[in-house]
Curated annotation (Swiss-Prot):
Gene: SNCG
Repeat (Sequence) residue spans along the chain: 20-30, 31-41, 42-56, 57-67
Keywords: Cytoplasm, Cytoskeleton, Phosphoprotein, Repeat
Post-translational modification: Phosphorylated. Phosphorylation by GRK5 appears to occur on residues distinct from the residue phosphorylated by other kinases.
GO function terms (MF aspect): cuprous ion binding
Organism the protein comes from: Homo sapiens (Human)
Principal location listed in the UniProt entry: cytoplasm
Chain positions covered by the region annotation 4 X 11 AA tandem repeats of [EGSA]-K-T-K-[EQ]-[GQ]-V-X(4): 20-67
Role summary: Plays a role in neurofilament network integrity. May be involved in modulating axonal architecture during development and in the adult. In vitro, increases the susceptibility of neurofilament-H to calcium-dependent proteases. May also function in modulating the keratin network in skin. Activates the MAPK and Elk-1 signal transduction pathway.
One Pfam family matching this protein: Synuclein
Protein name per UniProt: Gamma-synuclein
Length: 127
């Protein structure tokens, strides 16, 4: 009987040892799995943040480019509108060309062209 007890005791120790080893192995595997998942999650988060930041920066650059183009276009339209309004006022005789102050520095070609137009208007009587 002692032989059986001793045999079963040894077997029990073996099973307990195996269970402990299995439990330890499962725990280690779970820890490694957790580490792996956390690593992948952290890297994914970094990449997502980097991608979002990159997209936001590109969007900001594009918005700046568009706003610069819009401002430039608005300035051009405003300048042309003022020029045309001045031309209409001069042509209709409401104001004289000399009474208008220059809205922007003119280039040489534009200044001589306007002088010719004023001279022609004076000859034709403003019609």
């Amino acid at each position: 009987m002692d032989v059986f007890k001793k045999g079963f005791s040894i077997a029990k120790e073996g099973v307990v040892g195996a269970v402990e080893k299995t439990k330890q192995g499962v725990t280690e595997a779970a820890e490694k799995t957790k580490e792996g998942v956390m690593y992948v999650g952290a890297k994914t988060k970094e990449n997502v943040v980097q991608s979002v930041t990159s997209v936001a920066e590109k969007t900001k650059e594009q918005a700046n480019a568009v706003s610069e183009a819009v401002v430039s276009s608005v300035n051009t339209v405003a300048t042309k509108t003022v020029e045309e309004a001045e031309n209409i006022a001069v042509t209709s005789g409401v104001v004289r060309k000399e009474d208008l102050r220059p809205s922007a520095p003119q280039q040489e070609g534009e200044a001589s062209k306007e002088k010719e137009e004023v001279a022609e208007e004076a000859q034709s009587g403003g019609d």
